[in-house]
Amino acid sequence: MAFAQGSRSSLSFIVESTFGTTPAGNFTNLPFSTHSLNLTKDRVAGTDIQADRMPRVDRHGNRQVAGDIVADLRDADYDAFLESAMLNTWSTNVLKVGTTPKFFSIEDYAADIDQARLFTGMTVSTMGISLAPNQMVTATYGMVGKDMTIGATEKTQDAASGAAPFDAYSGTLEIGNTNGTPATAAIVTGMDFTLTNSFAPTFVIGSDSAPQLEVGRAEIEGTISAYFEDAALINRFLNETETELEVTVGDGSNTIKFAFPRAKINSADVGVDGPTSRIISMSFVALYNTADASNLVITRSA
């Protein structure tokens, strides 16, 4: 008897037109590194007091799906997931924060034992991007969804794009004043940011799965680490300077740019960890900018 191996696993997806309903048609293969998609159920326990002290009733309650998909960021393959994270659609290769959710059916297939878990009503609740020297650009999509079923039939898949992952060597990070002209900062050692939508299921009487998901604000926070070269970055924190941050990454042929047109630096810590170079550790929050009508603007190459 075979045990399912991670090396024989695949993810694929299709966009839903009706929340929680898998449409007809081919799924699209989704490159990934790891995932933790799972169905959970609440428990509903009886409260009767028994003379022998032992409970009699424990039932399954509300159902919901959650988990992370971790992947190397690349061209094309995750464009629909970027739309889901931003609640908007691409317009001439530009994507801004919007208000229209996008939902998926996602299949987790174990090829060696021919078992497929189908997750429905899935959307991107959080999106985290991590950049550092000597590594691929990592994206973590925190998914929330409606329900899951399991079966022995794999969905027909269209192939992924085959695009190479983006790396930090092909990227730049620029810093400047809001609505100004940012300049390349060649002293940055790392950057991470997370977009949080706070999707959550809304449960009603008569169903153990949510008829819809509610959504919160598009909150974006991140961190930047840079060599302590002068006072410029620290002054942005001290003076509460509204700052524009732009980071562009690529694969040698294609690029994607994440622009935060109006950010606030909320900390600038400089410690001494030993005899080597000192590092400034900064945190930032991205705010709505009137000129861009967004707090995050994503631009992909044509």
Regions inferred by a protein language model and the residue ranges of each:
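Signature of extracytoplasmic/envelope-associated structural regions
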Residues: 1-302
